[in-house]
């Protein structure tokens, strides 16, 4: 009887100790894959100049990311100030009577989270300026980060050799030249630019190449995102 009680106590201790020593899977997952929280801000209180800030991750990483994102907003603000100064130089008495739209300049910026998974973050930042006429001029800038370290990635961090650039360019060309509406303006390899200035976004199992509006003349539906599987450049 005493032997059975002793055996039961021993087994209970072993099970308890085992459960204590084995780490929680969920805890490990959360520790290795940060999940950021986003807050929206208006630069200098201007509701037309929006930018994000992140929290809920490593403080040093968040500080690096937030500094870069706020820097993007500062550039937009500088462009906004330049545009408003240009607006003041308009010969209003002559020009505004004929075409009132040409006297109403505007500038705005906003952002969108394109990828937030596996410890990587991609945010696209849009700028739009209107200086009269039928439409304004827009641009898009990608910001890619490591959520653990705050590292700001450029495409040369992904495509590390000239061979990788050529492989990606060839893959993008093969796709674009065979799919409308891109195929109408992509007929040779040189029509597809892939270099150290090319923008990208992280994606599941690869990246997206990101181009500006009208960079491919036959594509008029915003900013082209071209998927490149990781197998192409790894």
Name what the model sees in each region.
Residues 2-7, 25-234:
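Compositionally biased intrinsically disordered regions enriched in Thr/Gly
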Residues 12-21:
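Bacterial N-terminal signal peptides
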